[in-house]
Amino acid sequence: MRRLYDWVLSWAATPYGAWALAVLALAESSVFPIPPDPLLLALCLGVPAASMRFAALTTAASVLGGVIGYGIGAGAWHLFDQFFFEHIPGVSPESFARVQGLYGRYDFWVIFLAGLTPLPYKVFTLSAGVFAINFPVFVLASCISRGLRFFVLGGLVYRWGSALRGAIDRHFNTFTWIFGILLVAGFAVVALLR
């Protein structure tokens, strides 16, 4: 894992690091399971002065990926709805309508919390499209939550870059375990909510 961290950190010195970050952030919001935070952190640690630029890039790509996820959910649901209703226990037109009503009532907060936490954001972007929540509210909640998440990380590195990098270098294994636990907890919460 340490070698992977060092390798990702080296991307900050290449012209491809920002591109990789943008692609990862876009893909993670719609279809890919790996969050962009580790790469964002690595790039920010590699070039602390560019941390806010990396945070802005990650936010923009993540919101765009969320819009793509929303579109996939909205466009593809009608192709699979009958399969879900007929073959997935607990999924019926009635339960779908009930969850859709909850999404409609709490649309901003569902997307805001999903975008801010380690929960798999793509699950919520796809389901936002499936449940046809208010699109401007979806975009607003995505911009605020993803921006807050990534700009806090970028701001911390911008302010305390060298000290933060030293702490990560000294306690790398501990941070890796904490991140892994948060990631597993996020997936567990999603599984429990189903």
Predicted segments — roles?
Residues M52-A97, G101, R105:
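Membrane helix-loop-helix hairpins that form the core translocation module of multi-pass transporters
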Residues R2-R3:
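Selected transmembrane alpha-helices and immediately adjacent juxtamembrane segments
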Residues G75, V189-R194:
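Juxtamembrane and boundary regions of transmembrane helices in multi-pass small-molecule transporters
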Residues D6-T59, G101-D169, T176, G180-G186, ...:
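Hydrophobic alpha-helical membrane segments of integral membrane proteins
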